[in-house]
Amino acid sequence: MIKYLGSKRLLIPSILETIKTVPNIRTVSDVFSGTSRVGHALKKSKFRVLSNDYCEFACTLARCYVEADDTLTADAEKIIRELNGLQGSAGYFTETFCEKSHFFQAKNGERIDAIREEIEKKSLDEPLRSVLLTSLMEAADRVDSTCGIQMAYVKSWSKRSHNPLQLRVPHLLARSPHGSSKAYCMDANAFVMSNEFQGVDAVYLDPPYNQHSYLGNYHIWETLVKWDKPEHYGKACKRTECKVKKSKFNSKREYFETFKALISNIDTKLIIVSFNNEGYLKPDQIVDVLRTKGDVCIRQTPYKRYVGAQLGQYNPRGERVSEVSHLDNIEYTFYVSSDPSVVSALNKD
């Protein structure tokens, strides 16, 4: 899966274990799906999964790893063999992300251009189209020249950027015995109030924590998926949409009320919330909101900050303008249930 700030790889075993302790959980919703690492793990554990994300690239990943079933693997393998045989042809991607900026070597940018144009020409149905786009995203991610996010590229080419671009077939899973999984691209608060959210037994929430927009952090993937060849700005060649498409979860002023509204519209057997010590809300504020839905258990997981945050900030001349404040973060996981026995069992662990 793609490199992603805030990946929940370390939390997945605990999340799965907890959900399995609650009786009659069949459908689980991942409301801020990101890379779909959590959604993929849930589907692998036989749950029916409803994924959602505000960004189109994240929804594409969810269509691949959550919505698509393994019955599509043979078709994907055939087309990916064909795409891997294409010669490069410079276009928008090469010009924007290899020449005007240096996120990728030109030889790989040219192949990305050629492969993406070929996918577009095929006019494939979903979710097969998203399986191929995910394969391309992940191939590009393996040869980029960043510290993990697309706010900037490194001054000297990364070692991996010299490798040739090669598509791989994503690992698709069997359909859940509880029904087909589905991916949506909606505002989170609108999603939990929609008909699509009906029948959800448990929900996992991993909202943005602060002002940093995932659209801005991963704008290249959004452009690659939409293939709208947008106008852009700055050294990172961000799509201009980044200036106007904002989530209320990126606003300190609006965050608390938006989070409170989100929780108020969820009525499931279990709610799981991830949050970070660098976020706008303090743990006690989150607990106060969650207690309206039942008893709350909190767990903490320490982890290293992403590599870019460990370097400090530098001006255009390469001079350090700020020191690193801390190297470690804490991930809080809140478990909420109206069934006291569920939270009681968690508190004994």
Feature roles, as predicted:
Residues S33, E95-N217, K229-K245:
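SAM-dependent nucleic-acid methyltransferase catalytic core
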Residues F57, A62-A114:
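Conserved phosphoryl-transfer catalytic core
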Residues S247-K293, C297:
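Conserved Class I SAM-dependent methyltransferase catalytic core
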Residues M1-F32, R37-S45, T60-L61, A68:
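S-adenosyl-L-methionine
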Residues T223-L262:
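Glycine-rich S-adenosyl-L-methionine
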Residues K282-K348:
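C-terminal catalytic and target-recognition region of SAM-dependent MTase-like enzymes
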Residues R26, V200-D201, K269:
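Conserved acidic residues
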Residues V49-D53:
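Conserved SAM-binding motif I beta-strand of class I
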